[in-house]
A protein has these predicted regions:
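Short, polar/acidic, helix-capping and beta-turn segments at strand->helix junctions
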Residues: 1-155
Length: 155
């Protein structure tokens, strides 16, 4: 039986993929006590990297927000794996760390990462409200425009 969070995802038309396997010497998440640390997630959808390029150059703010949303969906996939498939065990999204591959003069990192923050609140309600960092990066793996990591509390 689907839980409340799965029902909310379905209502929003969001399909959560299986948690992506790491591409280097790390794991997708670590659980310490009741805290889950999710490794940086990139905008990968259906096995393909989306929105590759620098924000402020090839990638618009709106496209970067979509990239951030895909990152958030991939974070939710990792949390689902960490919770044994039951997203209702997520008590709180504690923090998101957002990295934006942008031109040196780009200053709208917070608006970009809102793509992920807004989704967390849409999906988890008040439990999705979190602290956050939104910073610029000179480059990100594979040239993706956004990477986001997360900290969450679980039951």
């Amino acid at each position: 039986m689907a839980g409340q969070i799965d029902a909310r995802l379905a209502e929003l038309g969001i399909e959560v993929p299986d948690a992506a396997a790491p591409v280097a010497n790390y794991v997708g998440y670590v659980i310490s006590g009741k805290t889950v640390f999710v490794s940086g997630q990139v905008p990968m959808k259906d096995g393909d990297f989306q929105y590759v390029g620098k924000v402020g150059d090839r990638i618009s703010v709106e496209e970067a927000q979509e990239a951030a949303k895909i990152c958030a969906i991939n974070i939710i996939a990792q949390l689902k794996a960490a919770c044994g498939g039951d997203l209702d065990k997520v008590k709180r999204i504690v923090k998101l760390g957002g990295f934006v591959n942008s031109t040196p003069d780009f200053t709208k990192q917070p608006q970009v990462i809102n793509g992920a923050s807004d989704l967390m609140v849409e999906v988890f309600g008040d439990k999705g409200k979190h602290s956050r960092a939104a910073v610029s990066a000179g480059a990100l793996p594979i040239g993706v425009s956004v990477e986001i990591d997360a900290i969450a509390e679980i039951e």
